[in-house]
């Protein structure tokens, strides 16, 4: 979904953004059903074990919910921007953002493999990588904020790009927290 949102904005593809919207809603509904089943399953654990697992389960659950909201906050302005045929993102911004999107996608793939398999041996590397990505995004975001103060022609596109940078940074934070909570839950 993250990939569909970012690619949809960069390529001005409304269909890709609408697909991301449907995927996001389906994933959120699936997560709600899964969470209910997990809560019922937690009742069958030993009391002391359930207390510890319950904390990490709810932290992970809250992180996943925040990931959904983060993607939605990224999607809605992007969908509006592309649907209304506003000026596209400048090529410079697309060139700057593309490698970050690729790194985030790679991080998502590794995180998903870890969570699905329950093997968190590479968790520390993902956390370090996420931290360095957040720092890079912060630097780009600050330069965009400075750029916004001096630019007057393409403010909507710059604000959209700034929103995408901020939400990507928040998205990475939530992924890092999810990895940590999942690792502790599996222990």
Model regions and ranges:
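Cytosolic, long alpha-helical scaffolding segments
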Residues: 1-187
């Amino acid at each position: 979904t993250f990939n569909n949102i970012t690619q949809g904005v960069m390529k001005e593809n409304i269909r890709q953004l609408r697909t991301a919207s449907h995927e996001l809603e389906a994933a959120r509904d699936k997560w709600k059903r899964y969470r209910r089943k997990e809560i019922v399953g937690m009742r069958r654990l030993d009391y002391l074990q359930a207390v510890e697992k319950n904390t990490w389960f709810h932290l992970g659950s809250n992180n996943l919910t925040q990931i959904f909201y983060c993607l939605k906050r990224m999607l809605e302005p992007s969908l509006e921007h592309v649907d209304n045929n506003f000026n596209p993102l400048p090529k410079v911004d697309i060139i700057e953002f593309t490698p970050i999107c690729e790194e985030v996608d790679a991080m998502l793939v590794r995180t998903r493999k870890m969570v699905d398999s329950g093997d968190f041996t590479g968790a520390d590397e993902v956390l370090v990588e996420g931290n360095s990505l957040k720092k890079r995004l912060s630097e780009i975001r600050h330069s965009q904020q400075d750029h916004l103060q001096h630019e007057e022609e393409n403010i909507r596109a710059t604000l959209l790009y700034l929103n995408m940078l901020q939400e990507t940074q928040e998205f990475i934070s939530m992924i890092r927290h999810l990895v940590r909570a999942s690792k502790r839950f599996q222990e």
